Regions:
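Short glycine/serine- and small hydrophobic-enriched flexible loop segments
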Residues: 83-90, 142, 211-214
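Short secondary-structure boundary elements
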Residues: 84, 128, 132, 149-152, ...
């Protein structure tokens, strides 16, 4: 991107998280996108309701809730969270007060969705218990993010799932079955073109990878943090933050 701009005078608009490398380059003008407002959320929900993926009265219930719940509006601070909340709302036992609380409910809510919706046709292929499936998904997120991997072929998805099952001591389960459930039941990993699978959003991968690290023993956490610190110190661009 920088080379195209400097060598050919091409003006380029890019999107990025704040604080990434491109934000600190010379001749870059940074603009910050405003957080979405209540009216934006309602407009998105109206559009989502056209898919008829949930019951007809769900939209009005959410509208009513948004009018009196500022905390909920602040939680749904990006289109992704609005979409996920709309899908998950009929199956939530309680309304989340923060993005972190919402993410903590996300996998289980979607994994159990077929049990709670009468006309939901997809059945889980794997018979491992839901808490174990959650652990495997967290391990998959950790292993892939550790390898700087955000997308998969079908074969590599099966391989990462197999490795994640081994990390969780669930070797008896078929990787193909649990991978199917991650894609077709939770939809947190999605098909994207021919033989390509991606996480619904990078934040899904990041949150569940953090959950995996949180579940490690104290000694394993020490080893992991030591490896991260060493990696930072060996990376010139990051050494100042070590």
């Amino acid at each position: 991107i920088i080379s195209l701009n400097r060598r050919h005078g091409v003006q380029i608009i890019t999107t990025s998280r704040g604080g990434t490398e491109i934000c600190t380059e010379s001749n870059i003008i940074n603009y910050t996108v405003n957080k979405i407002k209540r009216s934006d959320i309602m407009s998105m929900l109206k559009k989502l309701s056209e898919s008829q993926e949930v019951e007809e009265d769900t939209l009005q219930q959410i509208f009513h809730m948004l009018k009196g719940n500022t905390s909920l509006v602040e939680t749904m601070n990006c289109p992704l969270l609005v979409t996920l909340f709309y899908i998950c709302y009929p199956h939530l036992d309680s309304i989340p007060d923060s993005a972190t609380e919402f993410y903590s409910k996300l996998f289980t809510t979607l994994y159990f969705r077929h049990d709670k919706v009468k006309n939901y046709k997809r059945e889980r292929k794997s018979d491992i218990p839901p808490p174990e499936a959650f652990n495997v998904f967290c391990a998959l997120c950790f292993k892939s993010i550790y390898d700087n991997k955000q997308d998969f072929t079908e074969l590599s998805l099966f391989e990462y799932t197999k490795q994640s099952l081994a990390l969780c001591g669930a070797n008896e389960a078929r990787p193909e079955d649990i991978a199917y459930d991650f894609v077709d039941i939770t939809c947190l990993i999605q098909r994207d073109g021919y033989d390509r699978y991606v996480f619904l959003h990078k934040s899904i991968q990041e949150y569940h990878a953090a959950e995996y690290v949180k579940s490690l023993s104290l000694e394993k956490k020490r080893q992991f943090m030591g490896a991260i610190l060493e990696s930072i110190q060996n990376e010139p661009k990051l050494s100042a933050t070590a």
